[in-house]
């Protein structure tokens, strides 16, 4: 009887995977049915249910190993049986390493879950992530901006026409004219950061770049997203600002774990946690920022929120309050932490390679000025930033799509419908097929001379497949604020390197610092980055 029930349940569930709620209802209904039919005491019913679930688990494991459509794809044996393999890697903060390791071990296509594949094929990337690519997978159901409001952010929308409408609204906030309007705020916050650095220099102390860049991106994010001095209304000191960023990291880490099993989301939200207070404080912060700016209305304040309050010119659609709240959370997270991550990695790599820093400083000092148009034309500056994003993409293992009805043939491989496919830009960016000496920081690979020499025979044949670089993601889901991020990063780098010489603080361990970075949806850098700043004799401030 138990075997029959478990076999029937498996036959049903493998065709339509239940949600956590549906499975709980199934268990409760079955318990009630057993108690009525068998007239057994409660303890006996519990034992029967345990036996049934054990048999069901064995049947599922055997099916996934030997009869599942994805059995032909290699991968870790545990990953074929349970999503717990990738969940464990996410919990340990090493998903980016895992995706790279399995690609090197098993090849282009690897099974990383019972119904999920990972690929490092750039041909598959362009097909699946392109303009006519596949819809987003279930990992977006536990998206970072799917909060208590119930609304979808532009990041978590799965419906492609709806996403296109939302992107048109967002695009207005990042036109060249709109971006130029954010420049005064960036310049003011840069001056504030330089003043703090000068104070630390006078004390003879090192500067924690993790703290200073964190406060800088917090202030600029608040100014550009919600209006001038918006962040100061809630966080007046550096400690307050950095605390918000730390709390944000806790939220990001939680989402980075549960997105591998989205049905865990309501359970995790309800589960008591030592970080619950921090997560709630971050939610209150984003809610307060949203409500404060919403109540101000359109007005003359041309911040990002001004454009989000407008309508789509093609359809006349306006965002609902729940959608605005979700997009506000997205603004806070992607507007701050991703920029800080790239800048921290950038300065770490330059400090580890002083010859590259000297070459970049020479280019900056020779520039006619440090305006955004002038900086955008500096080839070596752009090369160093690109190389940083190649080695340390701020969102390193998070692109998931789902195969549409009818299945598909990609690169000669039959992909069944409903199969999730994941891309890791960290793994692809470090693939020797696409980049020579892929593990090394070599900004010269991006210079025009190196590109012109591609394919030339010599001591070493340079490989640079630009299709394999997607630091700002790719396709319809690519970063809408890419040009703003470029401008902000160039200005920060140029301002610091034309005013100071940098060196590691005494006792600072760059290897241990880099080893402390974890990926949980985004790349998280939380340890202090102690750097000695020496003012240049002629500063360009």
Swiss-Prot record:
<dbReference type="InterPro" id="IPR002401">
    <property type="entry name" value="Cyt_P450_E_grp-I"/>
</dbReference>
<feature type="binding site" description="axial binding residue">
    <location>
        <position position="479"/>
    </location>
    <ligand>
        <name>heme</name>
    </ligand>
</feature>
<dbReference type="InterPro" id="IPR036396">
    <property type="entry name" value="Cyt_P450_sf"/>
</dbReference>
<protein>
    <recommendedName>
        <fullName>Cytochrome P450 67</fullName>
        <ecNumber>1.14.-.-</ecNumber>
    </recommendedName>
</protein>
<dbReference type="GO" id="GO:0005506">
    <property type="term" value="F:iron ion binding"/>
</dbReference>
<keyword id="KW-0479">Metal-binding</keyword>
<comment type="similarity">
    <text>Belongs to the cytochrome P450 family.</text>
</comment>
<keyword id="KW-0349">Heme</keyword>
<keyword id="KW-0408">Iron</keyword>
<dbReference type="InterPro" id="IPR001128">
    <property type="entry name" value="Cyt_P450"/>
</dbReference>
<dbReference type="GO" id="GO:0020037">
    <property type="term" value="F:heme binding"/>
</dbReference>
<keyword id="KW-0503">Monooxygenase</keyword>
<keyword id="KW-0560">Oxidoreductase</keyword>
<dbReference type="GO" id="GO:0004497">
    <property type="term" value="F:monooxygenase activity"/>
</dbReference>
<dbReference type="Pfam" id="PF00067">
    <property type="entry name" value="p450"/>
</dbReference>
<dbReference type="GO" id="GO:0016705">
    <property type="term" value="F:oxidoreductase activity, acting on paired donors, with incorporation or reduction of molecular oxygen"/>
</dbReference>
<dbReference type="InterPro" id="IPR050121">
    <property type="entry name" value="Cytochrome_P450_monoxygenase"/>
</dbReference>
């Amino acid at each position: 009887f138990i075997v029959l029930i478990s076999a029937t349940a498996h036959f049903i569930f493998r065709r339509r995977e239940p949600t956590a709620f549906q499975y709980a209802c199934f268990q409760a209904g079955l318990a009630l049915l057993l108690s009525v039919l068998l007239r057994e005491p409660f303890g006996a019913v519990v034992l029967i249910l345990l036996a049934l679930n054990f048999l069901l688990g064995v049947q599922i494991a055997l099916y996934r190993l030997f009869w599942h459509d994805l059995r032909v794809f290699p991968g870790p044996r545990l990953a074929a049986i349970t999503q717990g393999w990738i969940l464990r890697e996410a919990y340990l903060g090493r998903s980016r390493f895992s995706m790279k390791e399995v690609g090197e071990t098993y090849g282009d296509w690897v099974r990383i879950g019972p119904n999920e594949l990972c690929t490092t094929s750039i041909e598959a990337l362009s097909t699946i992530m392109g303009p006519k690519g596949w819809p987003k997978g279930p990992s977006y159901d536990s998206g970072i901006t799917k909060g208590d409001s119930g609304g979808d952010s532009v990041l978590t929308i799965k419906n492609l026409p709806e996403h296109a409408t939302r992107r048109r609204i967002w695009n207005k906030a990042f036109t060249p004219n709109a971006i130029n309007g954010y420049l005064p705020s960036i310049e003011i916050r840069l001056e504030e950061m330089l003043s703090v650095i000068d104070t630390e220099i006078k004390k003879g102390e090192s500067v924690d770049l993790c703290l200073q860049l964190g406060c800088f991106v917090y202030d600029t994010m608040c100014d550009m997203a919600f209006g001038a001095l918006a962040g100061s209304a809630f966080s007046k000191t550096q400690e307050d600002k950095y605390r918000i960023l730390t709390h944000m990291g806790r939220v990001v880490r939680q989402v980075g774990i549960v997105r591998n099993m989205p049905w865990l989301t309501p359970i995790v939200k309800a589960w008591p946690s030592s970080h619950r207070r921090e997560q709630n404080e971050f939610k209150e912060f984003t809610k307060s920022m949203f409500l404060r700016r919403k109540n101000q209305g359109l007005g003359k304040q041309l911040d990002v929120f001004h454009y989000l309050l407008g309508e789509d010119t093609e359809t006349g659609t306006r965002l609902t309050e729940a959608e605005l709240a979700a997009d506000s959370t997205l603004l806070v997270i992607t507007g701050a932490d991703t920029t800080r991550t790239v800048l921290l990695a950038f300065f770490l790599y330059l400090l580890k390679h002083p010859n590259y820093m000297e070459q970049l400083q020479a280019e900056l000092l020779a520039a006619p000025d440090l305006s955004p148009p002038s900086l955008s034309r500096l080839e070596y500056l752009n090369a160093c930033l690109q190389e940083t994003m190649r080695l340390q993409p701020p969102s390193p293992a998070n692109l998931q799509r789902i195969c549409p009805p009818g299945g598909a043939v990609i690169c000669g491989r039959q992909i069944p419908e409903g199969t999730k496919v994941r891309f890791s830009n960290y793994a692809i960016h470090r693939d020797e097929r696409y980049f020579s000496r892929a593990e090394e920081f070599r900004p010269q690979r991006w210079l025009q001379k190196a590109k012109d020499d591609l394919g030339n025979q010599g001591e070493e044949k340079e490989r640079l497949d630009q299709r394999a670089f997607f630091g700002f993601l790719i396709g319809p889901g690519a970063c809408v604020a890419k040009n703003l991020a470029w401008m902000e990063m160039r200005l920060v780098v140029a301002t610091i390197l034309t005013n100071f010489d940098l060196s590691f603080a005494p006792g600072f361990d760059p290897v241990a610092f880099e080893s402390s970075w974890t990926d949980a949806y985004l790349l998280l850098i939380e340890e202090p980055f102690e750097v000695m700043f020496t003012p240049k004799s002629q500063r360009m401030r």
